[in-house]
Amino acid sequence: VGSEMCIRDRADYDQKRTQMVFSRLNNSNQFSTAFIDASNQKMIEELAAKNACNVIMNAVDPIFNEQIFDAAFNTGCTYLDMAMTLSTPHPSKPFSECGKKLGDYQFERSEAWVKKGILAIPGIGVEPGMADVFARYAQDHLFDEIDEVGIRDGANLAIEGYEFAPNFSIWTTIEECLNPPVIWEKDKGWYTTKPFSEPEVFNFPGGIGPVEVVNVEHEEVLLLPRWIKCKRATFKYGLGDQFIGVLKTLQMLGLDNKEQIEVKGVK
């Protein structure tokens, strides 16, 4: 039958905790643990082959997606992730035109996966993933026509006692919030705008209430128009003024730059 391999981030691991969980499992013959460097494609492929894996579930920072995605292809494994391959802004018109979009790397290789007869389901977490399923359900069962699919995330990013405390990967937070957000319209296709644009107050249900949300780059806008018949697709996040202020300061200081810098001869 083979086995499933879940890739965890090399920068976020504790092998003792992994062993602790493993020791509590009733059927130790069904599970195993191993150290793996998620940036090392060869290492991933060797471990997948050694364990006769048939599924690779990628649960790490999307900066590692390409090599894990390619490792799954090379080893014939079904592949799933919760965030798609990264984007690159347009070199001269970043706030109006798309450069390399989220997931482009994966979609460009779709035909090769089909020909090989293996399955890849990128973006199958909550956002993206569950939100896309909800949208498809709405199209199939609730509405005759859809003007806009608007994903609204009312996340509370404040933690008492901390001035700035993202609740997931700090780098992913900086990148997705400061990258040009993507919007899709039926007559225009995909285009970009400035970060934190088009603020609106959305009244969330369940006692959450009104929260200001702004445009943020997210996979749903790249996925939904491919399968949902709508006139517009957007994603907005409830970041809050303080959180946005910190992000703008990081950008002003150049601390959002992915390029290597040299300090006293060290990169």
Regions found by a protein language model. Name each.
Residues 1-7:
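Short, small-residue-biased leader/transition segments that mark boundaries at the very start
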Residues 14-17:
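Helix N-cap at the beta1-alpha1 junction of Rossmann-like dinucleotide-binding domains, i.e.
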Residues 26-40:
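Rossmann-fold cofactor-recognition segment
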Residues 37-52, 64:
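Conserved Rossmann-fold cofactor-binding substructure of NAD(P)-dependent oxidoreductases
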Residues 54-57, 72, 79-80:
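N-terminal Rossmann-like NAD(P) cofactor-binding module of classical short-chain dehydrogenase/reductase
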Residues 83-118:
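Rossmann-fold NAD(P)-binding glycine/threonine-rich loop
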Residues 108-156:
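Adenosine-phosphate binding glycine-rich loop
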Residues 140-267:
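C-terminal catalytic/substrate-binding lobe primarily of soluble NAD(P)-dependent oxidoreductases
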